[in-house]
Amino acid sequence: MSFEQGFNRLWHTIAGKFRKRRRERFVALFPPDKISSIVDLGGLVSHWDGEQRDITVLNLMPQESNHCKVLVGDGRHTDLPDRGFDLAYSNSAIEHVGKWQDQVAFAQELQRVGKLVYCQTPNRWFPLEVHYLTFFWHWYPKLLRNYFIVRYFTGWGWLVRPDRRRVQEYADTVRLLTYEQMKELFPDCSVERERFLGLTKSLIAIGEPSQNFARAEAPESRAGAPVRR
């Protein structure tokens, strides 16, 4: 087995355990008998395989599904109705939508369209940058984040073997958030810390928005690409 193959297997084993634990926590918080309609902003239909609820997935890219309603759109500005879903959900998407003002718009859309909110994102202060699968990557100077370094010296480069366009796309769109920023984006929600080895790996905003959010104005540019895990 090559080093890349071993790394791939190890990462998918660890990531799979986190997904399983997070899924169990999600079902406990939002049981199907109480939460029947869910909208996923910026998600993938494969995330909802086996789910029996009424699921709507909105993403920039077209997707096909036999079990989800699929919409093509920008999560920062949607035509979805106010409080039109029992739960507005997002998993590892808000860090991809652009600058701070784009993240504000995305967070407000989640709180506008859902009676309840669930928004997960990687923690900026976790030492391992989970998109590049490299320690301290998000703290390196931009000069080092070039194609050659990304392709041959990051875990993501080994696993995905991205082309130059995708490397640049990640560089332009990934903006990680802190606990304090998540509290600011979701003032009515509790922000849970998902830990690994005692360190906060991910942040999850969960709660019921108490204020009414107006639909945001249409953004000048489209939001970033979805995460593929």
Write out the residue ranges for each language-model feature.
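Conserved N-terminal segment of class I S-adenosyl-L-methionine
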Residues: M1-D82, L87, L199-S202, F213-R229
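Short, glycine-/aromatic-enriched active-site segment of Class I SAM-dependent methyltransferases
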Residues: Y132-F135, G155-E169
